[in-house]
Amino acid sequence: LRVVRNGIGIEQLFSVDISGLLGLWSLTVAQPASCDSRAMDIDTDDARLVLLVLSLVDRTLLLGWREPSGEQVDVAEVALSGWRLGEPTLAAGLASDRRHVVQATSSAIVLIDSVGWTVQAEWVPGEIGMSAISAVSVSGDQVAAAIDGRTIVYLEVRQGALACVGHRQLDNVVSCIDVHSWHGVAGPATHVAVGMWSVNDVCLLALPDLVTAAPALSLRMSQGLALPASAINLASTGQDSLPRSVLMCTLGNTPYLLAGLGDGRLHQFALSVDADGVSVREHKSIALGSGPLGLTPFVNHGSLNVFASSDHSAVLFADKHQTAH
């Protein structure tokens, strides 16, 4: 694991050997919070607390430090109450107030208050008669999850609680899910994007009712067609090309639906999003690696970029009304 800070250049803060790493999330908590450390003390002044949430095969590991911390970064393993550390984490993120943290595991979605690290709310699949969470996306106060493979649940953080707004069952098993907004921090997500295991599709479900937005589109559609898109076919070319990650984002001024496949290819769908729905303006596919491709949004100097991780990594950004990497 290498941790870097992006400023004038990319500065490596520290590195550590970790085996069995399944996923990681970086959270910068705005509120001052105390940490009980197993390895070393972490100051509890008003500097921002940075947490790395590491999902391992059988547990969750938290690493923390304070920002700004100068050139020396004192990283410690921390044991915080409220976190479900005895099982892997599927997703983690900050609520819009940057004080509350959402952690999702296969057994529960938990809302944690960073002041005191207490559990504020908890949602479990048993509330809708199901057993296990299989995929989750967290974006601010919005949470979308796949339950028992085929059921999509949409939750919102509301005044320190987790409200289940809606759920519906799909015909196919979900491989990946995303609830990021095309509006960034300017507004909430209006759709959930869902990738499917058994068919090479990404479908768009309108929020809050999770209704299918529109009919399916073929991958081989021509540029300039303005057809409504709810299920975007990624062509049936084998298990390796099934969608492993999906992301809704705006690069420059253009909304995109991005799908990362198991063979390292990236599908980019440039969209038009308005009151009449969603339409595809342009589609292209590029190879960024040869293994499963993950997609993570981040902000660099005020502009949204996307980190694409596979056996090779790349950064996607807007360049003269198109994407570059």
Give names to the regions the model predicted.
Residues 1-325:
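Large eukaryotic, non-enzymatic subunits of multiprotein complexes that serve as scaffolds/tethers
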